[in-house]
Amino acid sequence: MRALGAVVTLLLWGQLFAVELGNDAMDFEDDSCPKPPEIANGYVEHLVRYRCRQFYRLRAEGDGVYTLNDEKQWMNTVAGEKLPECEAVCGKPKHPVDQVQRIIGGSMDAKGSFPWQAKMISRHGLTTGATLISDQWLLTTAKNLFLNHSETASGKDIAPTLTLYVGKNQLVEIEKVILHPNHSVVDIGLIKLKQRVLVTERVMPICLPSKDYVAPGRVGYVSGWGRNQDFRFTDRLKYVMLPVADQDKCVVHYEKSTVPEKKNFTSPVGVQPILNEHTFCAGLTKYEEDTCYGDAGSAFAIHDMEEDTWYAAGILSFDKSCAVAEYGVYVRATDLKDWVQETMAKN
């Protein structure tokens, strides 16, 4: 029965493999797995059940139980020979952030509450954010990807110039960068890793939402490696709790009016955010905490208490507010989901 023991060992790592049975699949003469007792008018079936390691879940057409048939094939009553898969769990941090806690002046993430947060460094050493959305893909902003590159640069030009870390400074290699086809309006790009990351309590994707969580007053959390009070990049991941703002007030703050012919693009920080139907704003907390340079690419994470799941309601695009301007600007995740899923499926 050594072959079955090998299956269990491999499954503990969240991987599923065909069973190598040797010359005699029916030979149970093994001290570690004695032959089961016989019963009158009955027989013994040889069964295996596939399970996944912690932070993975089984995706199967059947129940994950396979029986050895007369042809020495492991078969499931629904899926036949097709094996199930272990897929990464998303949005289920082992140590979620305390809802009562309150990056310019944010709190330190000491317990890994934001395992989807990645740190990206440009070829000239500038730190930005990225968000893990599967065990092989991340979202970030197009502006982050274009840092120190011309506007005509392609994803192939950009990918080799980036350094990317997940978890506690785990270096990962980038296979490709894919920019949104309308990235001047939808400030987003995708990063594909060369290898899938092992999902742990420190490295876990956040879920993309199927419904819109964005509503004025709704609170989300944003983590990041951006600049702090003294305008230096932090070496500790920080987070802040921010409310979704009234969109019209945000537009007036940056553009002086919601009426197109009356707009005056005079941002209080000297840089204009991209504001359109694909974006939403989040305001300062009462403690005047805010995001800042280097936090872009991070998720506006919202906890769905009914599902006990964390979703990326948006991706931070405009991180220049730094407690000077009143609002950070985010790309709506619901507007990205179709493009993200199609792009991942094709690549």
Curated annotation (Swiss-Prot):
Domain of life from the UniProt record: Eukaryota
SUPFAM superfamilies the record matches: Complement control module/SCR domain, Trypsin-like serine proteases
SMART domains: Tryp_SPc
InterPro entries per the UniProt record, alphabetical: Haptoglobin, Peptidase_S1_PA, Peptidase_S1_PA_chymotrypsin, Peptidase_S1A, Sushi/SCR/CCP_sf, Sushi_SCR_CCP_dom, Trypsin_dom
Localization per Swiss-Prot or TrEMBL: Secreted
Main location: secreted
Residue span, Peptidase S1 domain: 103-345
Keyword flag Ribosomal protein: no
Function in brief: As a result of hemolysis, hemoglobin is found to accumulate in the kidney and is secreted in the urine. Haptoglobin captures, and combines with free plasma hemoglobin to allow hepatic recycling of heme iron and to prevent kidney damage. Haptoglobin also acts as an antioxidant, has antibacterial activity and plays a role in modulating many aspects of the acute phase response. Hemoglobin/haptoglobin complexes are rapidly cleared by the macrophage CD163 scavenger receptor expressed on the surface of liver Kupfer cells through an endocytic lysosomal degradation pathway.
Disulphide-bonded residues: 52-86, 90-207, 250-281, 292-322
Keywords for this protein: Acute phase, Antibiotic, Antimicrobial, Antioxidant, Disulfide bond, Glycoprotein, Hemoglobin-binding, Immunity, Secreted, Serine protease homolog, Signal, Sushi
Signal peptide start and end residues: 1-18
GO molecular function ontology, one term from the record: antioxidant activity
Gene Ontology terms: biological process: acute-phase response; defense response to bacterium; immune system process
Gene that this polypeptide is encoded by: Hp
One annotated Gene Ontology cellular component of this protein: blood microparticle
Domain notes: The beta chain mediates most of the interactions with both subunits of hemoglobin, while the alpha chain forms the homodimeric interface.
Protein name: Haptoglobin
Organism: Mus caroli
Sugar attachment sites: 148, 182, 264
Keyword Nucleus in record: no
Subunit-structure text: Tetramer of two alpha and two beta chains; disulfide-linked. The hemoglobin/haptoglobin complex is composed of a haptoglobin dimer bound to two hemoglobin alpha-beta dimers. Interacts with CD163. Interacts with ERGIC3.
